[in-house]
Amino acid sequence: LSGAIDRNDDVLYICYDNEAYMNTGIQKSSLTPFGAKTTTTPAGKNSHGCLTQKKNVFEIIAAHGLPYAATASVGYMNDFLKKLERAKDIHGTRFIHVIAPCPTGWGAPESKMVDLARDVVDCGLWYLAEYEGEQESGVPGGTFTLNRKPREFTSVRDYLKSQGRFRALSDEEISLVERSRDAKWEMIERDWA
C-alpha cells in the first residue's frame, strides 16, 4: 500500500477493520484495541487482553500525502456511501478505513453489529473523518475534516461492557480507555480545526 501511495497508483483501497485477525481464529492485530480479548491476548485472572493501543492507520496513511483518505463505520452507511462517491471522483491512491464489527470476535449477537458500529462512533472511540492531500485541498500538507462530532459522548463503559471481548476490563482500565479517548479528541479539535 505504501508503494502504491508513493507511485500515486489510481486505486481505491478499503481497509475492512474488525479489530483482529477474525478469519483465522481471532488473533490480535495491530488494530486490536487495548483490553480486547483475542486467542493470542487472552483475558482472565492473570491476563487482561491486549495491552497495546490500536494503531491509527488513517493518520499513518494520511502522513503519506495521498490525494484522499477517510474513516467510516458500517453503523453510519450514508456517511460511508458519501465517502465512496467522493473517492470515486478522485484520481490517484484513495484509502477508506471502515470499522465493521464481528459477532464471534466481539462477543456480541449478530443482530447488534450495526448498533455496535454506531456506538463506537457515538462514544468517541472511532471518529468519522476525511483527509484531502495537497492535490485536492490546495493546502500544503493537506487538510483533515471531522465529519461527525457527537455533542456529548455516550458511555464508553456501556460500549465496552456490551461485548464479550472486554468483559474482563477493570474500572481502572475502562477509565484509561476514556482518558485515551479524551486525549485523542483534544488533539483532533486542536489540530484539525
Task: Explain the meaning of each model-derived region.
Residues S30-I90:
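Conserved thiamine diphosphate
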Residues L1-N23, G75, D79-K82, A87:
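Thiamine diphosphate
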Residues C15, A69-A72, F95-I99:
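Short, conserved beta-strand edge motifs with alternating hydrophobic and charged residues
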Residues L1, N23-K28, W106-S111:
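Short acidic, glycine/serine/threonine-rich loops at helix termini
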Residues Y16-A20, P42-S47, L125-Y131:
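Short C-terminal domain-edge/linker segments immediately following a structured domain
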Residues A100-A193:
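Flexible, low-complexity linker and terminal segments
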Residues M22-N23, N78-F80, I96, P103-G107:
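Short acidic/glycine-rich loop or secondary-structure boundary segments that cap or lie
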